[in-house]
C-alpha cells in the first residue's frame, strides 16, 4: 500500500540560486499563468458580471491546486466525477487558503518548500481516497479514520504556516485579496461601464462606491470572524470563509453602480442626429399664466351615524327639542308609554329621581289608577308639583304651614316634612269627595270647575280601587290655589308603597302555595323513587341468587371431577404398592424356606427388609383410608 507520508514531493525549479533572490518561483509563475488565462477578471463585459467574481476566484484556486501537483488531469477527473459534495467543499476551502498564502508577498524559500510538500501530500491523498461516499475528506467514520487523520495533519500544517506568515493577523489573507484582485475587478467594471479615464478610476475609493450600511455589515462580519479565529485558533475552514466573504464584496456595488448609470443617462440623454441644446438659453419673456397657481380642490367627507354628524370642518352634537306639542293620538297610548313620552319631552325640567318615581308608580299601579296619575302628569302643573317649594311670601302652601299638630292628630294624619298625608281605613271612612276642595280666587271659576271635576275623577278612581282591595288606602288632600291643581309627591310615594305592599303579600301567598305544592311533589317523587329502588333491588337479588346457584352447581361439578381424578390416581398407586408388597412377601417366603441359615447370618438384611415392609404396609393403610373417605364424599 502506498504511504502518503513517504510521497516524493514534486520539484519546483528556481531561476535564482539563493533563497533571497527576487525572481518568481514556479508557484508564483503558475499564478501568473492563471491570471492571464482568465481575462474576464481584468475587463468584464458589464456590471451584471460582478457576482461572477466569487465563482471565478474559486475556480482559479482549484486550478492552482491541480496544476501545482504535477497530476492535474487525474485530480481534475476525480474531482469532477465525485458525487460527494461535502468532500469537494473541503478541497475547495483548502485550495482557497493555499492560493491566498502563495499570493502573499514576502514568502521565503523555506515557506515555499513547505508548501510544495503540503501540495504533494494532499494531492496523493485525493488520488488514494477517490472522493467516494466514505471519503476521508468528509465526516469521520471507522472506515476512513486513518486517511482522515492524515488529512487533518496536512490541513493543520497549512494553517500553522499561514499563522506564521501573517504574524497571527487573521484577516491578512482576506485584506490582501480585497486590495489587489477585488479592487482591480471593481475598477475594471467601472471603467468598462462608465467610460471613465484610468486616472479617474484609479482615484476612486471602494468605500465611496459601496452603500454605507452594506459596508458596515461587511466589516462587522469580518471582525466577528477575526474574534473567532483569535479565540479558537487558525483553521482552514475559518480562513476560507473569510476569503469567500471578501470574494462577494463586488455584489455590494450592484445597486450603487446602477444608480450612477441612471444618473448619467438622465443628465446626458442620447439623441440621435440632434445636437444637445446649450444650457444658458435666452429668456423668451413671461409665459402667460405662469404666475397663476392652480388651487387643489379641498375634499370634505361627511359621515352620518345615528343622528350624529362627523365632518372634517364642523362637529354637530345631538340636538334636543324641549318643546311640548299636544297630540290627540297620545290618548290611545298606554300609561307607561305616555309617561315615557312626557319624561323625554320634559327631560330638562324633571330631576332624575322624580322621573324614576313616576315610571315606578305607573308600572306597578292598576290601569285605572295609572290613568289618573298620568292625567295629572300631563297637566301643565306637573312641573310646579315637582319643583315648587312652599314659600310664605307668595301665599302658596300657606295652609299647609298653618295646619296645627292637634288637627293632624285628630284627622289621624301622618306628616312628611311640611305636607300632610291623611291615611284612613277604607272600612270605616266614607269615600272621598271633592267638595272640600275650594278655590281662593273668585275670578277663575272656569278653572276651578275643571279642577273640581278632575279631582272628582281622581277620588272616584281611588274609591273604586279601595272597594276591590280590602286594605288600607291613601286619601290625598288636593289644594287648589290660583287655578292650579297640585298633586303632592307624598301621595304618589305612599300610593306606590301601598301597592308594593299588596303585591308583596300576593307574591308571598303565591310563594306559600307554590312551596306547599313543591313539597307534595317532592314527597311523591321520593315515594316513587323508593318503590322503584326496591323493585330494582329485588330484581338484582333474584338475578344474583340465580347466578350464585349456577356458580355453586358448576363448582360442585368441577370438584367432583377433580375428586374422581384424585381417586383414580390413588387407586393406581395403591395397586402398585400392593404389587410391591406381594413381591416382598414372596421374597421373604423364599428366603425363609430355601436358606434359613443364611438369613440368620444376615440379620441386618432381614431387619432392613422388615422395616421396608412395615413402611410400605403403613403407606398402603393410609391410602386405603383416603380412598374410603373419597368414596364417602
UniProtKB/Swiss-Prot annotation:
Regions of compositional bias (Polar residues) in chain numbering: 330-348, 400-415
Region (Disordered): 267-294, 321-348, 388-455
Induction of the gene: Synthesis of this immunogen is repressed at 30 degrees Celsius and restored at 37 degrees Celsius.
Extent of the signal sequence: none
Gene disruption phenotype: Cells are still able to induce low levels of internalization, but are impaired in their ability to enter epithelial cells.
Subcellular locations according to the entry: Secreted
GO function terms (MF aspect): actin binding; vinculin binding
Biological-process GO terms, alphabetical: positive regulation of actin filament depolymerization
Biased composition (Low complexity): 438-455
Keyword terms: Actin-binding, Plasmid, Secreted, Virulence
GO annotation, cellular component aspect: extracellular region
InterPro entries linked: SipA_chaperone-bd, SipA_N, SipA_VBS
Main location as per UniProt: secreted
Domain of life per record: Bacteria
UniProt keyword Secreted, yes or no: yes
Its biological purpose: Rapidly associates with the first 265 amino acids of vinculin after bacteria-cell contact. This interaction is critical for efficient Shigella uptake. IpaA acts as a potent activator of vinculin and increase its ability to interact with F-actin. The complex IpaA-vinculin induces F-actin depolymerization along with the occasional formation of actin filament bundles.
Family listed: Belongs to the SipA/IpaA family.
Subunit and partners: The association of the vinculin-IpaA complex with actin occurs via the F-actin binding domain located on the tail of vinculin.
Protein name as annotated: Invasin IpaA
Organism: Shigella flexneri
Gene that encodes the chain: ipaA
